[in-house]
C-alpha cells in the first residue's frame, strides 16, 4: 500500500539525457533527430555518443 501522494519510485536516470538536451537546443540537430533518431543525429553533429 502506498500512502496518498506517493507514487512509484523515480525511474533510473537516463545517462544520455544531458546529450539529448544538447541536441534539442540545436535546431538542426533536433530536426535531424526527428528523422533519424537522437543518437545518429548527435553523432553527426558532435561525434561519438
UniProtKB/Swiss-Prot annotation:
Q: Which SUPFAM superfamilies match?
A: GLA-domain
Gla domain location? 1-47
Residues where 4-carboxyglutamate occurs?
17, 21, 24
Q: How is it modified after translation?
A: Gamma-carboxyglutamate residues are formed by vitamin K dependent carboxylation by GGCX. These residues are essential for the binding of calcium. Decarboxylation promotes the hormone activity.
| Positions of Ca(2+) 3 binding | 24, 30
Secreted in keyword set: yes
SMART domains with a match to the protein in the record: GLA
Give GO BP annotations, semicolon-separated: biomineral tissue development; bone development; brain development; cellular response to insulin stimulus; cognition; glucose homeostasis; learning or memory; negative regulation of bone development
Q: Where in the cell is it found?
A: Secreted
PROSITE patterns to which the protein is assigned, alphabetical? GLA_1, GLA_2
UniProt KW keywords: Biomineralization, Calcium, Disulfide bond, Gamma-carboxyglutamic acid, Hormone, Hydroxylation, Metal-binding, Secreted
Gene Ontology cellular component list: cytoplasm; extracellular region
Q: Where on this chain does Ca(2+) 2 bind?
A: 21, 24
Family label = Belongs to the osteocalcin/matrix Gla protein family.
The name under which this protein is listed is Osteocalcin
The source organism is Felis catus
Amino acid at each position: 500500500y502506498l500512502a496518498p501522494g506517493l507514487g512509484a519510485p523515480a525511474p533510473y536516470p537516463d545517462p544520455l539525457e544531458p546529450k539529448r538536451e544538447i541536441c534539442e537546443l540545436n535546431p538542426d540537430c533536433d530536426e535531424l533527430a526527428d528523422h533519424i533518431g537522437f543518437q545518429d543525429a548527435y553523432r553527426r553533429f558532435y561525434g561519438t555518443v
